[in-house]
Amino acid sequence: MVQRSKSSANWLREHFNDPFVKQAQKDGYRSRASYKLLEIQEKDRLIRPGMSVIDLGAAPGGWSQVTSRLIGGQGRLIASDILEMDSIPDVTFIQGDFTQDEVLQQILDAVGDSHVDLVISDMAPNMSGTPEVDMPRAMFLCELALDLATRVLKPGGDFLIKIFQGEGFDMYLKDVRTKFDKVQMRKPSSSRDRSREQYLLGKGFKGA
């Protein structure tokens, strides 16, 4: 029998005792992350019926489930992740590594000649536990997501992204502020207290 590490056992215990995990199972959401987006939605009303949205780092689909329900049948949702994701009705899913040009091009092709109202990203790299390694990886994903957002957002569009406090954060925040009318930070109650993750919200894209 494989022996689990102490940290792995602690994670499993925390996971199964987590009220948001239990609530997600009850409500039919694929992950506890759904409640992070729902809480931000409650405060900021980002997602509205009929919107066009891109969801990065979508698997297993918690944010896509919430977004699809809120935009309704007249909306359009393009989701992408390096991992597989079970299909969701009316959601276009692109599987692949977002850091690769061909995957970016697939997303751009799916958007087509139109633009989108909102880009959301819950992407995070596989964490090693070493900040000197993890932060550059995380910030690289954030930079790529912002680059995509500036290509596909309509003027006035919004951008929501998971970000971690650490090296590169201040410069990134400064960059986002040059591109959006209003920038705010959000820390949903469903985000674990010990997690360094926050969500950066850029509202009112100024245009490319």
Curated annotation (Swiss-Prot):
Record key words, sorted: Cytoplasm, Methyltransferase, rRNA processing, S-adenosyl-L-methionine, Transferase
EC numbers for this chain: 2.1.1.166
Domain of life where this protein originates: Bacteria
A GO MF label: rRNA (uridine-2'-O-)-methyltransferase activity
EC class name: transferase
Binding-site list for S-adenosyl-L-methionine: 61, 63, 81, 97, 122
Annotated transmembrane regions: none
Gene Ontology terms: cellular component: cytoplasm
Principal subcellular localization: cytoplasm
Swiss-Prot/TrEMBL catalytic activity: uridine(2552) in 23S rRNA + S-adenosyl-L-methionine = 2'-O-methyluridine(2552) in 23S rRNA + S-adenosyl-L-homocysteine + H(+)
InterPro entries, alphabetized: RNA_methyltr_RlmE, RNA_MeTrfase_FtsJ_dom, rRNA-MeTfrase_E, SAM-dependent_MTases_sf
Active site feature: 162
Subcellular localization, as worded in the UniProt entry: Cytoplasm
Role according to the record: Specifically methylates the uridine in position 2552 of 23S rRNA at the 2'-O position of the ribose in the fully assembled 50S ribosomal subunit.
Family designation: Belongs to the class I-like SAM-binding methyltransferase superfamily. RNA methyltransferase RlmE family.
Protein name: Ribosomal RNA large subunit methyltransferase E
Organism: Pseudomonas putida (strain W619)
Lineage: Bacteria, Pseudomonadati, Pseudomonadota, Gammaproteobacteria, Pseudomonadales
